[in-house]
Amino acid sequence: MKVLAAGVVPLLLVLHWKHGAGSPLPITPVNATCATRHPCPSNLMNQIRNQLGQLNSSANSLFILYYTAQGEPFPNNLDKLCSPNVTDFPPFHANGTEKARLVELYRIIAYLGASLGNITRDQKVLNPYAHGLHSKLSTTADVLRGLLSNVLCRLCSKYHVSHVDVTYGPDTSGKDVFQKKKLGCQLLGKYKQVIAVLAQAF
């Protein structure tokens, strides 16, 4: 495994972040002061809403592209194989304060970014010629990275939050082919479900 960031990488990150589609999402160190690299734009919440809307509008087509690329038995057994039963997924409470919702959004986006990295890595091996799927996964990961950066900027500039504890989904590298496909399908089913809620909440 290649360590993509210089310096000491937290053990949790090493164990669970195997992001094959690019560099890791930025995770703020525990001792970081609340300072952003660039001033936050004045329309930051609009950008966050737009990014959530963009992700929501493309989530279903990504899900369809994914399960179609896996072949049988996935397209005809979606309820069984792709149900969004992701037990360790971070919670979201739409009726919380803006600060609480942004912290939960940050956790969800970090979780999804790491999971998409695993899915992308697996799909490049399992379905090397599914270029449309690879491209869609990569585009989604790029938007997630931008969204994560914007959420952190808002948390830092308005609420002085410099660190959010995050968790990651299961690492798929030791799973068999079918389990990799199934976990990816379940995760994208959950992503489609939760991104619709998030888009409404902001």
UniProtKB/Swiss-Prot annotation:
<dbReference type="Pfam" id="PF01291">
    <property type="entry name" value="LIF_OSM"/>
</dbReference>
<feature type="glycosylation site" description="N-linked (GlcNAc...) asparagine">
    <location>
        <position position="95"/>
    </location>
</feature>
<protein>
    <recommendedName>
        <fullName>Leukemia inhibitory factor</fullName>
    </recommendedName>
</protein>
<keyword id="KW-0202">Cytokine</keyword>
<dbReference type="GO" id="GO:0005615">
    <property type="term" value="C:extracellular space"/>
</dbReference>
<keyword id="KW-0339">Growth factor</keyword>
<feature type="glycosylation site" description="N-linked (GlcNAc...) asparagine">
    <location>
        <position position="85"/>
    </location>
</feature>
<dbReference type="GO" id="GO:0005125">
    <property type="term" value="F:cytokine activity"/>
</dbReference>
<keyword id="KW-0732">Signal</keyword>
<keyword id="KW-0325">Glycoprotein</keyword>
<dbReference type="GO" id="GO:0048861">
    <property type="term" value="P:leukemia inhibitory factor signaling pathway"/>
</dbReference>
<comment type="function">
    <text>LIF has the capacity to induce terminal differentiation in leukemic cells. Its activities include the induction of hematopoietic differentiation in normal and myeloid leukemia cells, the induction of neuronal cell differentiation, and the stimulation of acute-phase protein synthesis in hepatocytes.</text>
</comment>
<dbReference type="GO" id="GO:0008083">
    <property type="term" value="F:growth factor activity"/>
</dbReference>
<keyword id="KW-0964">Secreted</keyword>
<feature type="glycosylation site" description="N-linked (GlcNAc...) asparagine">
    <location>
        <position position="118"/>
    </location>
</feature>
<dbReference type="InterPro" id="IPR003624">
    <property type="entry name" value="Leukemia_IF"/>
</dbReference>
<feature type="disulfide bond">
    <location>
        <begin position="82"/>
        <end position="185"/>
    </location>
</feature>
<dbReference type="GO" id="GO:0023051">
    <property type="term" value="P:regulation of signaling"/>
</dbReference>
<feature type="glycosylation site" description="N-linked (GlcNAc...) asparagine">
    <location>
        <position position="56"/>
    </location>
</feature>
<dbReference type="GO" id="GO:0008284">
    <property type="term" value="P:positive regulation of cell population proliferation"/>
</dbReference>
<feature type="signal peptide">
    <location>
        <begin position="1"/>
        <end position="22"/>
    </location>
</feature>
<dbReference type="GO" id="GO:0045595">
    <property type="term" value="P:regulation of cell differentiation"/>
</dbReference>
<feature type="glycosylation site" description="N-linked (GlcNAc...) asparagine">
    <location>
        <position position="31"/>
    </location>
</feature>
<dbReference type="InterPro" id="IPR001581">
    <property type="entry name" value="Leukemia_IF/oncostatin"/>
</dbReference>
<comment type="similarity">
    <text>Belongs to the LIF/OSM family.</text>
</comment>
<dbReference type="GO" id="GO:0006955">
    <property type="term" value="P:immune response"/>
</dbReference>
<dbReference type="InterPro" id="IPR019827">
    <property type="entry name" value="Leukemia_IF/oncostatin_CS"/>
</dbReference>
<feature type="disulfide bond">
    <location>
        <begin position="40"/>
        <end position="153"/>
    </location>
</feature>
<feature type="disulfide bond">
    <location>
        <begin position="34"/>
        <end position="156"/>
    </location>
</feature>
<keyword id="KW-1015">Disulfide bond</keyword>
<dbReference type="GO" id="GO:0009891">
    <property type="term" value="P:positive regulation of biosynthetic process"/>
</dbReference>
<dbReference type="GO" id="GO:0005146">
    <property type="term" value="F:leukemia inhibitory factor receptor binding"/>
</dbReference>
<dbReference type="GO" id="GO:0010646">
    <property type="term" value="P:regulation of cell communication"/>
</dbReference>
<dbReference type="InterPro" id="IPR009079">
    <property type="entry name" value="4_helix_cytokine-like_core"/>
</dbReference>
